[in-house]
């Protein structure tokens, strides 16, 4: 990340990923050299060392953060819910920088999405040839391939309750009885679903514990 006048706080600064070469299965990057007018030249290279990092129009801090809650009541019944959401931010998958090693080392288990890696000429995919070669492995490179939207909508709480009529409860010497069931983090939509957007810290996703789903009764 970088702090620069005119840019959002926690703006990302890194090399641009240019996809996988469909003929060789090797990762590609934009060189992003500057021309005489200060514009980026989008030439493609397979050598990470030939690519230049640039200031992106993507930042860790979301543009919108909010929530929505309400309580609905009908006779004995009540239903309370609360949604939380955020939009406009991005996060970098630091954990993938360890796992996306293409078979080059044994630092971590391989993600399941590597089933869709390049296998033969003509394959169009996001993931490189799976081979023990440091020239192909992506685990030591920081690129936009691992930069993901952190947009999400989450049902944070959902509570359903029943308040028994006093004509029933007073017969046993009790003025008020309410029974309820409550669930937390029951449902989540996320723009990128390989890690929890609320487990991100400072735009970095690594080893974060996601909010747990819980159900309580009372």
Please annotate each region the language model reported.
Residues 64, 75-77, 151, 173-177, ...:
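Outer-envelope beta-barrel architecture signal
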Residues 76-81, 167-168:
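Repeated loop/turn-to-beta-strand initiation elements of outer-membrane beta-barrel proteins
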Residues 1-26, 117-120, 188-218:
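C-terminal beta-signal and terminal closure region of outer-membrane beta-barrel proteins
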Residues 1-60, 100:
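Conserved small-residue
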Residues 4-11, 22-24, 86-178, 183:
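Extracytoplasmic gating/loop element in the C-terminal half of outer-membrane beta-barrel translocons
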């Amino acid at each position: 990340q970088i702090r620069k006048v005119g840019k959002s706080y926690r703006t990302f600064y890194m090399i641009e990923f240019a996809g996988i070469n469909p003929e060789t299965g090797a990762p590609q990057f934009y060189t992003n050299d500057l021309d005489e007018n200060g514009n980026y030249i989008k030439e493609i290279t397979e050598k990470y060392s030939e690519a230049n990092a640039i200031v992106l129009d993507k930042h860790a801090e979301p543009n919108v953060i909010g929530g929505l809650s309400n309580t609905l009541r009908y006779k004995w019944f009540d239903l309370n819910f609360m949604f939380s959401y955020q939009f406009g931010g991005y996060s970098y998958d630091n954990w993938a920088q360890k796992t996306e090693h293409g078979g080059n080392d044994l630092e971590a288990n391989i993600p399941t999405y590597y089933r869709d890696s390049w296998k033969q000429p003509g394959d169009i995919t996001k993931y490189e040839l799976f081979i023990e070669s440091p020239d192909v492995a992506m685990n030591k490179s920081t690129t936009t391939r691992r930069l993901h939207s952190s947009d999400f909508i989450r049902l944070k709480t959902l509570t359903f309750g029943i308040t028994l009529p006093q004509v029933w409860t007073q017969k046993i010497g009790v003025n008020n009885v309410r029974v309820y069931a409550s669930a937390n983090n029951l449902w989540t939509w996320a723009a990128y679903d390989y890690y929890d957007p609320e487990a991100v810290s400072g735009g970095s996703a690594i080893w974060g514990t996601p909010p747990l789903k819980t159900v309580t009764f009372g």
